């Protein structure tokens, strides 16, 4: 099964790559410092883990702005810019409440998002 990659645009006009797999309560998997959805999905261990999560959740994966299949013209690398992309993604997907997983460098902006929007975050997990 190929990962069904889609794109959306943030309010600032950045084109962001994302994918959703599975069914159930939403879980947003925030990317590491560098991400590439197609290359991640090519790794059997990652793919197997995501499929396991997708057995119980709608898993949302995305490439950071500036990485992978997302636009590469990023100039603002602040955590606030990452929060803005996360806000735009969950708004685009119309997710009212969801769990957040912050992997590596995405930890700070997942925490910042949860602090700003506690009514939307059901759980937060940092790796």
Segments (PLM) and residue ranges:
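Conserved hydrolase catalytic core segment
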Residues: 96-127
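Conserved acidic catalytic loop of the alpha/beta-hydrolase fold
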Residues: 80-98
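Conserved HGGG/HGGXW glycine-rich cap/lid loop of the alpha/beta-hydrolase fold
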Residues: 7-71
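Generic hydrophobic, aliphatic-rich segments that mediate packing or membrane embedding
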Residues: 45, 49, 82-86, 101, ...
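A structural signal for short coil/turn segments at secondary-structure junctions
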Residues: 54-57, 93-95, 117
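Catalytic nucleophile-loop/oxyanion-hole region of alpha/beta-hydrolase
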Residues: 71-83
């Amino acid at each position: 099964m190929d990962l069904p990659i889609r794109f959306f645009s943030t309010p600032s006009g950045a084109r962001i790559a994302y994918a959703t797999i599975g069914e159930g309560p939403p879980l947003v998997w925030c990317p590491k410092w560098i991400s590439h959805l197609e290359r991640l999905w090519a790794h059997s261990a990652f793919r197997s883990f995501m499929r396991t999560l997708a057995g119980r959740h709608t898993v949302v994966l995305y490439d950071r702005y500036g990485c992978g299949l997302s636009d590469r013209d990023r100039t603002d690398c602040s955590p606030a810019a990452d929060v803005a992309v996360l806000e735009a993604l969950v708004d685009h997907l119309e997710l009212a409440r969801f769990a957040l997983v912050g992997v590596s460098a995405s930890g700070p902006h997942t925490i910042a998002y949860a602090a700003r929007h506690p009514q939307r975050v059901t759980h937060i997990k940092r790796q």
